[in-house]
Amino acid sequence: MNAVTKITPHTDYKIADISLADWGRKELDIAEHEMPGLMSIRRKHAQTKPLKDVRITGSLHMTIQTAVLIETLKDIGADVRWASCNIFSTQDHAAAAIAATGTPVFAWKGETLEEYWDCTLDALTFTLPDGTLTGPELVVDDGGDVTLLIHKGYELENGSTWVDEPASSHEEGVIKALLKRVAVERPGYWGRVVKDWKGVSEETTTGVHRLYQIAEAGKLLIPAINVNDSVTKSKFDNLYGCRESLADGLKRAMDVMLAGKVAVVCGYGDVGKGSAASLRAYGARVIVTEIDPICALQASMEGFEVNTIESTLGRADIYVTTTGNKDIITVEHLQAMKDQAIVCNIGHFDNEIQVDALKALKDVQKINIKPQVDKYVFPNGNAIFLLADGRLVNLGCATGHPSFVMSNSFANQTLAQIDLWEKRDTYEKKVYILPKHLDEEVARLHLEKIGVKLTTLTKDQADYLGVPVEGPFKPDHYRY
C-alpha cells in the first residue's frame, strides 16, 4: 500500500487514508471509557501541563489505545510525533484520527522495512523555529528502535564503523543504509539530537533487554525508565493481555478450532503464561518449552507438559513463540512440522522464527492466503501457515490487547514521561523502574471501573506490618 503523505506548515503525516478519521474517532471515544487510569491522569494534569512544549517522539503500535495515550500526552502539554514500532500493527483508522487532529503521525499497516525506518526517522525529526532539524527531548519506545537509531547515529558521528560491517539481516542492512544517508544529508544531526535528549521510557521486554545491554557496555546516553517491569505492566499487559489477544489473532487469521489441538508455547515468562492460559481456555492441549528451570517448574505445576520443540515435531498443530530470543523455531523445525501446522510469534521481533531462512529455501512455494497469512509448501508436499510474517500475531492478525489492560501500561508510560522531565537534572544515565507507590496508584485508578472495593488497614494493623496505612504495601523485592 502506498501511504498518503501530507506536509503543510502546521503538520505532516504519512498514513493510509485520512478519510478513516471519523471511524477512528468513534472507536477512540469507546476506548477512553475503557481506560480509566489514563483518563484520570489526563484530567489530573490537564491544567498544570507538566510536559508543556516538551518534544516527544513515540515509537509504539499505532492502535486505538495508543491514540488515547497520544492525546493524553498532548493534553498535558507535549509536542508529539509518532510512528508505529511494527510494520503490521497499525490500525489505519487510529492513525487517521490522530493525523486529523494535527499530530504528525507516520504509520500504516503493511509497511516495508525501508518505509518503517523512514517513518521512525520522520517521527524523531523536529524542526526548530529557525529551521534547524533536531530531535525529541523525550522518547516513548517499544522495542527500542528509536533508542537504537539515535545511539547508532551518534556513534557513527563519533567514529564508529558499524555501518560498514556486513549486515546480519535484511533489517540491519536497512538501518545501516538509513544511517549512511542521514550522515550525508544531515551532517552533525545526531549530536544535536543527543544534546537535547533527556530520557526514554521503554514499553516492552525486548526493548528493556536492549537498554540493559547498552548500559552494561557503558554507552547509554540518557536516563531510561523500564516501564515493562512495573507490576501493573508486566503482570497485566504481558499476561492478561496476551491471554485474550493471542486467541483473537489465531482465530481471525485461521478460523481455527483450538479445542483438541496440540499447541506448543515456546517460553513461560509472563507472555508465555498468558499465551498458554489462552490456548488452554479454548481446550487446546498445551506443551511448554523452557530453558529456565524455575519457569519450567511453574509450567509443570500448572499442569502443562514441558518438553523440547524437537519432541513435538510431527504431532503439534500450533506453535507460538514468546521468548524475546532469536532462532527459537529454526528452518529445520519448520520443515519437520506436521502438515498444515500454524506458526506464529507473540514476542516483539520476527527473529524468534527463522523467517529469512525459510524464504531463502529452494523449491519452497509461498502462497499468500490473505493479509498476514502465508502458506509455505515444502517439496515433500507438507505445508505450514506462517502468521504476520513472524511478527506479532495479536497485532498483525487482530487488534492487540484490550483497552482496559493497555490503560495500565500507558498510565505507567505517562507517569514515566512526567517523571523523566521533572527530574531531568537529577536522573543519571542508568535504567530505572518506577517507584512502588506509583505502581500501586496505577492499579488503584482501575479498581472502580470493575467494581472493586479495597479493605483499609487500621493503624494498628499497618504498624504490625510496618507499612503506611495508605501504602505502599509491598517491598520492592516482592514478587507478585
From Swiss-Prot:
* UniProt keyword annotation of DNA repair present: no
Where the protein is mainly located, per its record? cytoplasm
Q: Where in the cell is it found?
A: Cytoplasm
List the SMART domains hit by this protein, alphabetically.
AdoHcyase, AdoHcyase_NAD
| Residues at which substrate binds | T63, D142, E203, K233, D237
In this chain, NAD(+) is annotated as bound at 204-206, 238, 267-272, 290, 325, 346-348, 394
How the cofactor binds, per note?
A: Binds 1 NAD(+) per subunit.
What Enzyme Commission number(s) apply to this enzyme?
Answer: 3.13.2.1
The GO terms describing molecular function are: adenosylhomocysteinase activity
One record GO biological process: L-homocysteine biosynthetic process
The pathway where this protein functions is: Amino-acid biosynthesis; L-homocysteine biosynthesis; L-homocysteine from S-adenosyl-L-homocysteine: step 1/1
Q: Which domain of life is it from?
A: Bacteria
- Keyword Transcription regulation (UniProt): no
* GO annotations of cellular component type: cytosol
Reaction equation(s) it catalyzes = S-adenosyl-L-homocysteine + H2O = L-homocysteine + adenosine
Cofactors needed by this protein, per the record, are: NAD(+)
Q: Tell me which UniProt keywords the record has, alphabetically.
A: Cytoplasm, Hydrolase, NAD, One-carbon metabolism
Q: What class of enzyme is it?
A: hydrolase
What is the role of the protein in this entry? Answer: May play a key role in the regulation of the intracellular concentration of adenosylhomocysteine.
Q: Show the NCBIfam families listed in the entry.
A: ahcY, PRK05476.2-3
Which HAMAP family does the entry mention? AdoHcyase
Q: Which family does it belong to?
A: Belongs to the adenosylhomocysteinase family.
Name of the protein this chain belongs to: Adenosylhomocysteinase
